[in-house]
């Protein structure tokens, strides 16, 4: 004890004197690896800062803690340490050693290991690790690999190499590199997984290391023997194996698994294996007392055992709906909101477990409600597929469908008294629609209007009831309260709170229905056609028609064959234009004449209508004698002498006309035609008016009056014939076709 006290006193004096010493300069990594252990550092302080090596039971890392100093001999501790920490001077204070002490199993790497630095998809550089025991990563300049990212700690992590034993052998943990996090703030990531602090994690060739939030990736390169072997198990099998390991570990931690049970299990396995080996012989494919597999009852499960999820993974809702249809049940999803955009979906399956309870498939999903429904359907399909019920034939498992009609389309669990949402009635209506009890007819404008009227009527009735009940409640009763209550109950004027709430809810539903119906009515409303208003011309035309009906149909005037309608009735039509000689057809056209012709035609139509009215008024004023039909037909026929005389006279006059005197001669021609009057007075009046009109409408030298073809009615002004220009026949050919031969 005296020796120990004396040593502690000497160490304390050394610490006091060491505070006034000059701090040591930073040493380069190469020189530091070769430099011997400095004796000026205090081993107790180093021992306090150095972490204890912890072992992860699941990752298979080394379970060798750093050596604990013996209070009796500090010199032996310094000799055992192969790599003591080197003090690194900080810019703002005295020298500070890294908080890491190399374990005794560490040693320099003899294999050609290297560390590649990758950033942005390109390799920035390669650092050789051959001959180094460990590599220190951090933000300080004294670290082996200096990182400038602000999320990297000053001393962040260490890549420690484990050397093999002296005889070339090693422990259960093989030689290689191990990653050790020095309790950094933002952590160290190995293959995108954050490793626990102060724990050695094995790093194989090809593994990727990242420090904090830095984007630089460090890839370990080395011999192929150190590369991690790929597992033959799938991801799901690895997850199941991991779960089993965790369960066994929990049992061991809780002490549930005793050594006796393990011994019993191992003994039973040995006995079973020995009996099987002893009884092994020719069994002809049939074992004695063989237990039939449950899967033999369902061959479809064996057929699709390797591809189970391929049957329903694309559309789980459809597969689950098909199962419920075969079972004769209704598929209903239940939703519970667990939090913000987090849904718990639940489906009750028509299958019982071994204890007789109904199986329920549940799924929690963060996102949309529809996605939670799909996840729940997928989980239900997996449960049913595990039981071998999802892909069975409909004949083998189909149950008898419920006869909803016997129960008035209500379920046995439905209770309308406790229902406040109206969901049960909606389900009942849907069942009735599926059964065909409710005929859905297409809505029309009339049906929508009728529904809107009914909704408005019901809405007004409910509002009146609510108003009356509120008035009764507001009025203070003069009589006894009990008598007033009994009278109100008999009259039914007052409403209790539940009925008032129901009426308010019904009012809200009716208003929504009213808005919906109004929107539909706007869509299907027929087009509004404005009413026809009678104009003055239509009224006068109707009066004239009524007057004409009272007149006789023939014998109105002589020479009526010219004015015979297509229907055979006698009437008045516009006058026929005379046929002009072909000499006038060869005259040149002038553009101004066309506008004058249109104006003159309009004036002619107005005058003709005026003459029609005058003639009708004259015929109504004087009575016309009745004429026999034969005489009327003879009078309606035009005299042939008169027409022949007109044609000859016009041809003679037109042949003698010159270009300068055409206007004057044409007026004389119209006078001669007007002098040749017929025997009747009406014919003379008509010819006079026609001559006056032709005087005003005398064509100029370049004007071409239109000619009528015999194919169309000559006495109908609605028809006109197009006349081809000079030198053309109307078939599209001109003199250029003949000239150039095309």
Curated annotation (Swiss-Prot):
Transmembrane segments: none
GO terms, molecular function: mRNA binding
Biased composition (Polar residues): 1-16
Keyword Nuclease among UniProt keywords: no
Keyword Transport found: no
Comp. bias (Basic and acidic residues): 72-82, 607-619, 732-742
Listed Acidic residues bias regions: 256-265, 591-606
Pfam families linked: dsrm, FHA
Tissues and organs where the protein is expressed, per its UniProt entry: Ubiquitously expressed.
GO cellular component terms listed in the entry, alphabetical order: cytoplasm; intracellular membrane-bounded organelle; nucleoplasm; plasma membrane
Span of domain FHA: 135-195
Pro residues: compositionally biased ranges: 96-106
Name used for this protein in its record: Kanadaptin
Originating species: Homo sapiens (Human)
Gene name as annotated: SLC4A1AP
